[in-house]
């Protein structure tokens, strides 16, 4: 009988594909690698964020220098702006793993090969990454929270309102997602005006993300997550959060391999404990998450000149609360307002007056 050993690289590659296809919430985030973090102090790199320049207009036929024109205008010198790029410190940290001991008897009589064990270990890592992604999603400070039980506004109009807010925040239309918990899913599927129930089960799923998708409405790909709180939903762009993974190096003293699939990396290593006649399998990945803040471009209504926001704002995502009877918007004035909320409301037109 021919002995055909399976290369560790193939095992790692299979695990990487399985892991990528098992993800739902992390799959909605923008992905990046870890090469830039290697060797960096405190596992932190400084990322330059491009600056924003305002446009300016010049008075037409404004007369001679220092002298008024017939309309009373004076020819003025043009204004020069300073261009600056901000530096943002981005930290990378975390190691999610699954380690299993496998006796000779288990390997030979119970599992019949490496495939079943690898599937289970990959599922474990997937659950860990899913939990981490949801934690970052739910702990983010959102500038806008829309109520799902606002008087006189059904769910359809709530989704339209979410679209309107992202439009006013100038978020690109392509790549928008509505991530919902299970309570939201029930309400959306039960709403005849949305007609989403007919989409469920239309096509064969090839990944957990596709399986979790229940339709597309008002520019949003609607995705369900059982990890997200049932009464919560998030309207966001896929670039709102960054999801980074990296495969640790395989030590020279053990058998192993690394692989990456669609930006999701993983390492597989194995050794044998002869004292106990036991295999030891370890599957792991480095991970990191962060949100993306933006500087905004506004226009002064008095001078009609553009300006760049003083503060950075998280505008690539908003929250929806199924039970809330009121919207929580940036306060433009009054009690509870902050310089950041006043600026955001002034630039975007999305805001409310405080008490």
Q: Where do the language-model regions lie?
A:
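Extended, solvent-exposed, turn-rich assembly/linker loops in the middle of proteins
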Residues: 141-220
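N-terminal "assembly arms/tails" that initiate or stabilize quaternary assembly
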Residues: 1-90, 325-355
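Short alpha-helical segments and helix-capping/turn motifs at coil-helix boundaries
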Residues: 27-34, 162-165, 265-267
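Long, contiguous amphipathic alpha-helices that act as assembly "spine/axial" helices in icosahedral shell
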Residues: 47, 85-154, 169-179, 222, ...
């Amino acid at each position: 009988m021919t002995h055909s050993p399976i290369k560790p690289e193939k095992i790692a590659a299979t695990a990487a594909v399985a892991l990528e296809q098992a993800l739902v919430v992390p799959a909605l985030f923008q992905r990046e690698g870890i090469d830039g973090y290697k060797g960096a102090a405190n596992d932190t790199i400084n990322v330059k964020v491009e600056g924003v320049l305002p446009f300016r207009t010049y008075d037409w036929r404004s007369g001679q220098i220092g002298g008024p024109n017939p309309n009373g205008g004076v020819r003025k010198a043009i204004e020069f702006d300073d261009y600056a790029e901000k530096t943002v410190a981005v930290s990378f940290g975390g190691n999610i793993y699954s380690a299993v001991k496998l006796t000779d008897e288990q390997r030979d009589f119970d599992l019949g090969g490496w495939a079943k064990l690898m599937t289970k270990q990959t599922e474990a890592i997937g659950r860990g990454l899913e939990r981490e992604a949801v934690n970052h999603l739910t702990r983010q400070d959102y500038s806008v929270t829309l109520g799902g039980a606002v008087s006189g506004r059904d769910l359809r109009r709530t989704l339209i309102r979410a679209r309107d807010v992202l439009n006013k925040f100038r978020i690109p239309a392509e790549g928008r997602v509505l991530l919902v918990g299970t309570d939201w899913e029930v309400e959306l599927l039960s709403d005849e005006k949305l007609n989403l129930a007919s989409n469920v089960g239309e096509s064969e799923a090839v990944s957990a993300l596709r399986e979790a998708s229940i339709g597309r409405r008002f520019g949003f790909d609607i995705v369900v997550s059982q990890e997200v709180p049932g009464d919560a939903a998030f309207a966001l762009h896929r670039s709102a959060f960054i999801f980074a993974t990296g495969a640790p190096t395989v030590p020279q003293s053990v058998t192993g391999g690394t692989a990456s699939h669609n930006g999701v990396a993983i390492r597989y290593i194995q050794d044998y404990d002869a004292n106990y006649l036991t295999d030891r399998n370890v599957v792991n990945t480095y991970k990191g998450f962060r949100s993306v803040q933006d500087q905004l471009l506004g226009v002064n209504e008095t001078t009609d000149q553009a300006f760049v926001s003083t503060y950075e704002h998280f505008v690539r995502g908003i929250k929806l609360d199924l039970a809330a009877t009121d919207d929580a918007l940036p306060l433009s004035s009054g009690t509870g307002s902050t310089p950041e909320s006043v600026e955001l409301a002034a630039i975007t037109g999305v805001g409310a007056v405080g008490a």
